[in-house]
């Protein structure tokens, strides 16, 4: 074969290989496009939630062409529908309390970016439970932490994060902006309410499904405020207790009934309760009960009983002689269902809770009568109705050598149980005013739930060494 023939033969071979390579590439491209359309055209049928993965791998070593395609498609059950929560189950029997979660936020914040918060709570939805709190818009180690002892500022926001973690700028979800809040899930979506603005003209913004739906102006011009723990929904109706007016005199309290973030009805407070703030609410047996703070007079807590079906309420005081506000006098010989029991100094009150279920009733309170230190749970049968009722069982939650703070009720209404299991949290306040060597005021959280077993006591205190922050 002469040189010209060799050149022609080599050229023809090269062109043939190039054409073959081109055809393979075109075929591979067509296959990839076909797979994409095939995955995207999933028929609309009721099938289980599954992950399907289609993989195509093409390797042409002779021409150094490598093509790897990995397509993952998540197919959701389009016919799956959520339903409104229905509060028909009773409360579970409780003989003691087991630990659920403790976030250790202050301990972790000594060496990490942890948000300064207060007024925390927990609230659950069909997927699980989350922690909530009002952030101060800064971290424990941030310079803006100076002055966070103040309750109201334009830098506060309701944030939520995964239960058990410490709140940080990296895991916290902003629910709404404000310095007073409540939040609850109706089984379909979450409603969150935040108050913000100046003391004499604050307003509330109601969010539902991640969007603002309703705005509420101040009606008394004196710090419009709400529960600082979760609200509760029944068949889509979510009552919320709000107060506007003096903290140490008669104020204007309203029970506002929402559905999907929109106002259905507004009621002025009726009944025996003389002052209402910071209610802790739970639902069972078709009824919602809110145990509140009388910041004006009472060391016994006011109770609001709400019928969400017909959107009405009544109010009275916890009848038991076991007083649960702080500060408070010594427990008297008799309780009072119809009027506040006065006494105690210097603090006018603290947010608290109770579960009122006949013989299965439990009350929470600080161990100290005069300050927010220690915490205990007392089983007090018929505390709601019996002025002679006293404790038959006791469990320490935080010892009296450590600070506590606000406390409140919550329930995982979607747990797979035949009854609603009561749960509660305790705010563990650190920093100012009691610990003035640091510039900030913040908290960690401990949460416990009911147990039919008889479990022992332990102190679930905050545990941070303030000296490490100096």
UniProtKB/Swiss-Prot annotation:
The lineage of its organism: Viruses, Riboviria, Orthornavirae, Negarnaviricota, Polyploviricotina. The active site is at residues 151, 406. The influenza A genome consist of 8 RNA segments. Genetic variation of hemagglutinin and/or neuraminidase genes results in the emergence of new influenza strains. The mechanism of variation can be the result of point mutations or the result of genetic reassortment between segments of two different strains. Its EC number is 3.2.1.18. Pfam families: Neur. Residues 91-470 are annotated as: Head of neuraminidase. This is Neuraminidase. Its cofactor is Ca(2+). Residues 28-470 are virion surface. It comes from Influenza A virus (strain A/Duck/Czechoslovakia/1956 H4N6).
